[in-house]
């Protein structure tokens, strides 16, 4: 599909990409997270906390770390399960194909295990985002979700070798959020 998804690369974007790639190169030069497993672990915990906080998880960073370490935490059962699920998803991430719709569903199933009745399945109903009582976004109709996701993944596969990975992942994320393929957990 020509001009899908719709995006334009600006000079400002290219400057950001250049700066980020330079930082990644510097980080890789020093062997980054592989050389420092404790840094990798702490980064993962912070990432889990931040990602879940966006989804209204109320656990603090310290509580998230305690859950991951197997300690008892006082908090909502759902919040605790979200942390366990996110950690499990991180553990499995190297086993999945980033260009597979089915693997995306598998990871979603892990992320929403024991939380959502339709874990790992595309939504089968309308979806909207609200700010209080005000509808601020309406997702595409559920019947279009499988085709939209196939189009998005096909675009990624076709462009993975000729679009910078930062741009590819950013466009993917934008379109993913627009499609809102799952009932819950789209932000994780």
Which residues make up each language-model segment?
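FIC/Doc superfamily catalytic core
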Residues: 1-188
């Amino acid at each position: 599909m020509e001009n899908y998804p719709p995006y334009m690369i600006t000079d400002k974007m290219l400057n950001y990409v250049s700066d980020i790639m330079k930082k990644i190169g510097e980080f890789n030069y020093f062997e980054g997270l592989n050389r420092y497993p404790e840094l990798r672990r702490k980064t993962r915990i912070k990432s889990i906390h931040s990602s879940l906080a966006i989804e209204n998880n109320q656990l603090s960073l310290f509580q998230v770390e305690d859950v991951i370490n197997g300690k008892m935490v006082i908090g909502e059962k759902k919040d605790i399960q979200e942390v366990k699920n996110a950690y499990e998803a991180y553990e499995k991430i190297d086993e999945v194909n980033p260009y597979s719709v089915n693997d995306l569903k598998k990871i979603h199933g892990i992320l929403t295990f024991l939380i959502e009745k339709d874990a790992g399945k595309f939504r089968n109903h309308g979806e909207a985002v609200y700010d209080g009582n005000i509808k601020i976004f309406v997702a595409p109709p559920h019947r279009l979700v499988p085709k939209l996701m196939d189009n998005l993944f096909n675009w990624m596969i076709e462009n993975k070798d000729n679009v910078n990975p930062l741009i590819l992942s950013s466009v993917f994320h934008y379109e993913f959020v627009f499609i809102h393929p799952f009932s819950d957990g789209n932000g994780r």
